[in-house]
Amino acid sequence: MKFEPELLRFENGDLVQDAASWRMRREEILNILRREEYGCSPLPPASVEGEILSSNPICCSGHACLQRIQISFDTDKGRFSFPFNLFLPNSDTPVPLFVLLNFRPDEYDRYYPAEEIIDNGFALAVIHYNDVTADTTDMNDGLSGMYDREQYSWGKIGMWAFGASRVLDYLLTRPEIDGENAAVIGHSRLGKTALWCAAQDERFRFGISNDSGSGGAAYGHAKVEGNEMIKDSIYYFPYCYCEKYPSWMGHDHELPFDQHLLLAAIAPL
């Protein structure tokens, strides 16, 4: 299969020749996706502060410590904060990290496999996505209300991704965490979020998505009847994207961009 548009060709027609020009092409790809699909995220805050609200040192049958942490940081409209859970396995050395964007608060299931992750020697940070901003059309809720919205402003995928990066900001200050080995994870629209987060934030070595579909890992040019199309994603979740994205409804096979560009942007530099 020939993927369109060409991954290693700039918008002006020039070809990527080496690692240095790939860096330039990668930034061009991110700007295309910001402009056409996910919107532009604000710059990261200068600092992120964290407060441990509670701590259970005998979680997961005594194999881990569970901490409830609240982080806070400055935004365009003042201070914003949200909580997350941190599971730390018993270890004398720094451990790799999973940051999970989760639909269900504090419900351990196949989407929130805390004990399996701990038993394999990883730390797990769990963000309930509604604590960042609600999964609704309300653009004044939570983080979405802390920035003015314009044509190319972020949708909620960008906001949830921003929240995951701020959690990583804080966790990189913790000596228990191996900051060289961090992954961001999500399912469905949070799978889209995990991919967009990993593409923008090079500190995440891995981006792991499950069933991310249209607007995630699905290649639009190859879709057939019965696949999730842009129109389906916009019908159910218009607030997840920038205001430009709906203009591509019905044009999945004609996109001047596609999701292989997103996946390539996650590749190590």
Kindly give the residue locations of the regions a language model identified.
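Mobile cap/lid helix-loop segments that gate and shape the active-site cleft of serine hydrolases
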Residues: 206-262
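Alpha/beta-hydrolase fold nucleophile elbow
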Residues: 177-188
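Glycine-rich nucleophile elbow surrounding the catalytic serine of serine-hydrolase chemistry
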Residues: 186-196
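Short, proline-enriched alpha-helix->beta-strand connector loops that line the catalytic pocket
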Residues: 265-269
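Proline/glycine-enriched tight loop/beta-turn segments at coil->beta junctions
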Residues: 78-82, 88-97
